[in-house]
């Protein structure tokens, strides 16, 4: 697993944020789809959904099979591109749109780093085969590589402090397609990945900021903790500390699960978590699907004390009661004020100005468009509007 990098800050104290993401010809997204974090309306409520002028908390709705999960893998593609870690990308995968004649999928990431704008874009034929890539900083092209035409422009590397890097070493490392015999072998290492591994950058440089953000991106797919405790032994060992066990107990209670917990080490060295009653009740064999899903979320994200830059939680509340869903949204907003969190759900109870706002609630349509509620109606949406009622009444139907 790729080691997380510490969050990078400018002298103004700003950490890098994703400003805009665009992808085309990827899976069901034949046409260009854009996720614009900078499209902030002027609402003066629930300001904790905004950070440094960009959307930091959003919820995406959409009918089944509109591509909410595909959007997650598209956004996280940069993580594999720049680190080589497979993450959620395992096995042979169909990447290109089945109805398009285009031979590559196009990705574009625009980052805001204090007063600096960083744009990284590339084209891929498959998950591992990159055909073209370009990096720009504040409108100036730093480098551009066309691997199909074998043309390279490294003329502005000095602008990011990499002017002394020997790019000929990189060019000689590129494996010709005819030399590749194993299916799925990477033919070209993206230049930006190679550059970060072979050059030394200042802690506050644009490249360090970009990698810090990418390495700390994460995705959580809906799943329960499963029936076996073996994969949890390391986590359970930390719960031998009574303070850590109490924090987990407090988390469950804050989510609406009234319980007390106990942990025992078994004779075989493994650990067993229990609900503490007059008689101890084994946790894994009796906990509900929602409770197991909460434990998995706690173990993976919350307890690790990681500071994710972007967290995509797909169908995050599939096992939760609507009140627990709302509790978790409030918890995430408070726990991760600077993290850009994207939640997908079918739970319209969260389509509310109590905890969100119209510019942070999106509809992913069957034709591959992503529209904020405030852009999906001619009506001026205000804090007092019942967004869920309007949604069910068909106010936003033409954007579904």
Where are these regions (language model features)?
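Conserved Walker B
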Residues: 26, 315-319, 348
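Pre-Walker A-like glycine/lysine-rich segment at the N-terminus of P-loop NTPase domains
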Residues: 2-77
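Short alpha-helix of the ABC ATPase nucleotide-binding domain corresponding to the H-loop/switch region
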Residues: 321-326
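Conserved ABC ATPase signature
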Residues: 58-65, 267-302, 310, 316-320
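Extended helical coiled-coil dimerization/tether regions that scaffold
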Residues: 8, 13, 24, 221-286
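Electropositive, glycine-dotted interaction segments
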Residues: 124-257
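Conserved P-loop NTP-binding catalytic core
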Residues: 53-59, 72-126
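C-terminal lobe/lid and adjacent interdomain/linker elements of RecA-like ASCE P-loop ATPase modules
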Residues: 5-19, 307, 327-400
